[in-house]
C-alpha cells in the first residue's frame, strides 16, 4: 500500500508513523502509560488492517489523518484527538504560507 504525500509523491505505507504521531500528541497531554501505549499501537494496527481489508492500494496523507482522528475520538481519546487536530491545522496553516502567529484553539464541540 502507498501513501500519496501532499507534494504528490508516493511512499510505502508505514503504520509506525501513525503510532508515532498519536504517541507524540498523547505525550503532550498525558504521561503515556503502558495501557495507553498499547491502545495507540492497536489503533494504528486497526487503521492499517481496515485499509488492507478494503483493498486500498494508495491513500492520501489527509485521508489517513482523518482516519486517525476518527479512531481517537471513537476510542474516547478526546484530548489526544484535540491536540492531534490542532497540530494538523497548525501545520496546514504553515504549509499554506500563513506564517502569522495563528493559535488554533479547539473545543470539544468543534471536534464533534
Question: In which residue ranges do the predicted regions lie?
Answer:
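Extended catalytic cores of very large enzyme megasubunits
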Residues: 1-112
Amino acid at each position: 500500500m502507498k501513501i500519496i504525500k501532499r507534494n504528490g509523491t508516493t511512499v510505502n505505507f508505514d503504520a509506525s508513523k501513525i503510532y508515532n504521531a498519536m504517541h507524540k500528541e498523547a505525550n503532550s497531554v498525558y504521561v503515556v502509560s503502558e495501557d495507553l501505549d498499547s491502545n495507540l499501537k492497536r489503533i494504528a494496527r486497526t487503521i492499517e488492517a481496515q485499509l488492507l481489508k478494503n483493498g486500498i492500494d494508495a491513500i492520501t496523507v489527509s485521508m489517513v489523518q482523518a482516519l486517525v482522528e476518527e479512531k481517537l475520538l471513537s476510542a474516547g481519546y478526546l484530548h489526544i484527538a484535540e491536540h492531534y487536530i490542532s497540530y494538523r491545522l497548525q501545520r496546514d496553516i504553515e504549509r499554506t504560507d500563513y506564517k502569522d502567529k495563528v493559535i488554533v484553539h479547539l473545543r470539544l464541540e468543534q471536534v464533534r
